Each structure stands twice: as structure tokens, then as C-alpha cells.
């Protein structure tokens, strides 16, 4: 797969860290400066009666502005500050403000000011933008208006900052990049790509929020006539043509099929068909998980259509698979461990896993990427991923000793891995090497990795 980093064909396998649980941390939703947006044309209308749904109740609180930008038509719905504040006052937390937009424009924009976003954040409210091709569900706290305010300068009033949440068709140039990526990656685009973005505009300065601290949901409508059984996943396509899987489910919503996508970043998304079957997994116990993860671009084969399911996994391979499975964007290749060089194929992957708190390495500052991954090491890393997906907080409070008491070799689990092992067992991601053994020191095979990553995503409700 030309646009997806592949795992090296070697017999080295994995081990996890002697980890002190550093906890998960994401890249944050801080704004990234970008070039100022092209000026909009004068509005063709200013309809003050666009309905906005507040917890399902319709209130005329939006004004529609039609414009053009870079040869694309734009419909902007500007939310009335006074009416939004009136709706928020006295309401309980977790309100959902829905903006249904009926428009054929290339770009759909919901526009609020920074103070409105701050008021919504204080109420833990969620903003939902609906168009005929996609829906974007954005918790107000993920805009991170405080970080945006700091970047623009604290002298700038929140009232004067425009927050623009967009659902857009890609530009002609970006569409060409996407089509080329599909050809190079041997997958078929099932629906037209959609770009999701969040921008903060103040004067001539535009900041773009590219990263979130929790998974943010968006849906893409599957057109009539498309077989939902011939969809394997949604993907993100970057401006340089690189592609990554993002966790995706196919659901029926209001009588139509939708791809429900959860991601920690904004970008251009599409839905693809990429069936994958590995010949040496045809009769393997993990066949379904292996082929599913392969079809989703999470795992790749070794050579000649083989997966070598019973080969042990290296630490670098495990890091790659969990980063891909979670849909994390790899950024930067500055080594964070003494034994990882910027020229190594796994350099940016390991840096990303470290940045998200998934791995911490050894006390001597090494990661030992070509050593084999043990089961207890893998359980520790997966438990950290559970924090990122929100699964950890759903577990009932129970001691590790009680959780693991049914395994006769529970005492063999290292002290640093005890809580991680208990969390993964309690969540149902790890069920034991046998009915009553964990075998924590055993190496983890490629088949086992495919199975546990699939379980992590399924039990977290992401696929």
C-alpha cells in the first residue's frame, strides 16, 4: 500500500515499556496559524429567521449569508448572540444546539463569536452542524477558546473573535490529491470527500484548530445506491497525499446509511472500499480480526499477500498498529528515545505514541523498538489507549486483585503492569491465554495484536 507506512519484514518482535503510567495526553486543540481566508463577497441576503434547534426545540436564531470564496459557493449561518444566550440561561448542562442547513453551497459555515463559544463551554454544550451530505458534532470545549484567546492576545475581546465551523467540499486541487492517493493506495472512494474545519478569525488573522483532546464525531451520508456492505472504513487524506484510517461505523440514521467517524483531528475525510484477505490467515482463529484490520488500513502484510499471524510482534510494530488503529496523525520525527533515529521507519510513529501518552520507554531512555512485545507490556499500552477512547472512565471501580483473581498466574504480572492488565481484562479486551491463565511474560503474536486492537475499538464504540 503505497501511501500507508508498512511494517518491516523481519523476525524481531515486541516488548512493552517498564512503564510508569504517564497518562494520556493529546496534542490539544490549540490553533495553528493559517493564511487569511479569501474575502467574502457582499451577502446576497440576510434572512434573520433561520431556525436553530435547542435541545430539539426550534428557535429562529440564525441569519443566512450567501457568498463566494476561492471559486466555491458559501452559506454562512450567523448565530444571534442574544437569542443563544437566552436559550442557555437557566438550562441544565449538556445542551445540544443543532443548526440544520438546507443549501447546495460548496461550503457550509456556522459562525459564532468567541464569547458565545465560552458560554456554551461553561454549560458543556454541544454544537451540531447538519447538511445534506454530513453532520459535525462538536463539544464547545473542544474549540478551546481559551487557547485561541491566548494566541490572539488577551487584549482581544472574545466578542470580537469569529469562530467558524465548516463542512466543505474539497477544492479542485485537493480533490486531485485525493483521487491520486486512492489510485496509489489501491482503494475505491465510495462517497465524495468532505472537509471539516474549525477556524478562529480576528481581523486579518486566522487560526485553525486542528487537534482535539477527545474524539469528535462527524458523519458522512452514504448516497442511495451505494452498498453499505462495500464500505471498509473512512480515511483522512492530508494535503501531501498521505492517508490514514479513522475509526468508523456504518449506521442507519433517519432511514439513511451514514458513516459515523470519530477522530482527534480536523481534515479532509472520505469513505472507502478496501477489502483485504491474507492467504495465510484463511483458516486462522483470528482470520476475521486480521482481515478487518487489514481492510481498515490498520495492519499490513509482510510479502506475497502474507500476514504471518503467528510471528511475534516487535515494539515498533505494536506502536505502529495502535497508532493507526486509533487514527492518530503522525507528526514530527524528532527522536524521543536514545535508540530511535529520525531515519528509522517507525520514528514518527513512536514519537506520536509517546506524545499521546501511550508509551514511555525504559528507565535508561531507550525504547528498544526491535525487541519483542510481551503480553503484559501490550496490556499496559492498551490500558493507556482506553483513557484516550474514553473506555477507562466507563469501567466500574474495582481493585486489580479482584479483577485478576480468576487467573492462576496473576501473581506473575509485574507490579508496573498490574493496573493495565486489570483494566484490559475488566473491559473484555484481554480474556487470557487460556480460561485461567494470563501468561503475562509471553510474547504477543501479530494475530493477537490484530484481535486486541479490534476489540479495543469495538468495545470503545469506535468501530
Regions inferred by a protein language model and the residue ranges of each:
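Feature responds to low-complexity, polar/acidic, surface-exposed segments characteristic
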Residues: 247-254, 263-288, 300-316, 322-349, ...
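Proteolytic processing hotspots in large secreted/extracellular or virion-associated proteins
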Residues: 69-240
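Secondary-structure transition/turn motif
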Residues: 81, 102, 132, 261-267, ...
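C-terminal, surface-exposed recognition/capping segments
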Residues: 233-234, 416-422
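Proteolytic cleavage junctions
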Residues: 1-21, 32, 38-39, 46-50, ...
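Short Lys/Arg-enriched alpha/beta "domain-start" segment
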Residues: 43, 48-85
Amino acid at each position: 500500500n503505497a501511501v500507508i507506512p508498512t511494517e518491516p519484514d523481519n523476525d524481531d518482535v515486541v516488548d512493552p515499556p517498564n512503564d510508569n503510567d504517564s497518562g494520556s495526553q493529546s496534542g490539544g486543540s490549540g490553533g495553528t496559524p493559517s493564511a487569511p481566508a479569501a474575502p467574502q463577497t457582499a451577502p446576497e441576503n440576510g434572512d434573520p429567521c433561520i431556525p436553530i434547534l435547542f435541545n430539539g426545540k426550534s428557535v429562529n436564531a440564525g441569519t443566512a449569508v450567501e457568498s463566494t470564496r476561492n471559486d466555491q459557493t458559501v452559506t454562512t449561518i450567523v448565530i444571534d448572540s442574544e437569542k443563544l444566550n437566552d436559550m442557555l440561561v437557566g438550562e441544565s448542562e449538556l445542551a445540544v444546539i443543532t443548526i440544520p442547513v438546507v443549501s447546495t453551497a460548496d461550503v457550509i459555515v456556522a459562525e459564532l463569536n468567541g464569547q458565545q463559544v465560552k458560554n456554551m463551554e461553561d454549560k458543556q454544550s454541544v454544537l451540531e452542524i447538519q447538511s445534506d451530505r454530513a453532520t459535525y458534532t462538536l463539544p464547545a470545549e473542544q474549540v478551546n477558546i481559551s487557547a485561541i484567546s491566548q494566541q490572539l492576545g488577551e487584549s482581544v475581546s472574545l466578542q470580537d473573535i469569529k469562530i467558524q465551523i465548516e463542512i466543505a467540499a474539497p477544492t479542485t486541487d485537493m480533490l486531485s490529491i485525493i483521487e491520486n492517493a486512492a489510485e496509489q493506495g489501491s482503494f475505491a472512494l465510495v462517497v465524495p470527500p468532505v472537509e471539516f474545519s474549525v477556524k478562529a478569525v480576528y481581523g486579518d488573522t486566522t487560526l485553525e484548530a486542528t487537534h482535539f483532546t477527545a474524539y469528535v464525531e462527524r458523519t458522512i451520508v452514504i448516497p442511495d445506491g451505494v452498498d453499505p456492505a462495500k464500505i471498509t472504513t473512512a480515511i483522512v487524506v492530508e494535503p501531501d497525499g498521505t492517508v490514514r484510517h479513522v475509526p468508523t461505523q456504518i449506521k442507519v440514521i433517519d432511514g439513511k446509511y451514514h458513516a459515523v467517524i470519530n477522530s482527534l483531528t480536523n481534515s479532509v475525510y472520505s469513505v472507502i472500499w478496501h477489502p483485504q484477505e491474507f492467504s495465510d490467515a484463511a483458516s486462522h482463529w483470528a482470520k476475521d480480526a486480521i482481515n478487518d484490520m487489514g481492510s481498515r488500513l490498520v495492519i499490513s502484510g509482510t510479502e506475497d499477500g502474507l500476514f504471518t499471524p503467528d510471528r511475534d510482534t516487535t515494539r515498533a510494530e505494536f506502536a505502529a498498529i495502535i497508532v493507526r488503529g486509533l487514527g492518530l496523525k503522525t507528526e514530527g520525527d524528532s527522536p524521543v528515545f536514545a535508540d530511535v533515529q529520525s531515519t528509522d521507519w517507525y520514528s514518527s510513529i513512536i514519537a506520536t505514541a509517546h506524545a499521546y501518552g501511550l508509551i514511555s520507554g525504559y528507565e535508561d531512555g531507550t525504547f528498544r523498538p526491535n525487541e519483542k512485545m510481551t503480553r503484559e507490556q501490550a496490556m499496559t499500552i492498551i490500558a493507556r489507549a482506553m483513557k484516550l477512547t474514553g473506555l477507562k472512565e466507563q469501567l466500574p471501580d474495582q481493585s486489580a486483585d479482584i479483577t485478576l483473581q480468576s487467573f492462576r498466574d496473576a501473581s506473575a504480572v509485574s507490579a508496573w503492569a498490574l493496573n493495565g492488565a486489570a483494566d484490559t481484562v475488566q473491559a473484555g479486551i484481554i480474556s487470557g491465554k487460556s480460561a485461567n491463565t494470563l501468561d503475562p511474560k509471553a510474547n504477543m503474536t501479530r494475530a493477537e495484536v490484530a484481535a486486541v486492537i479490534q476489540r479495543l475499538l469495538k468495545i470503545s464504540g469506535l468501530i
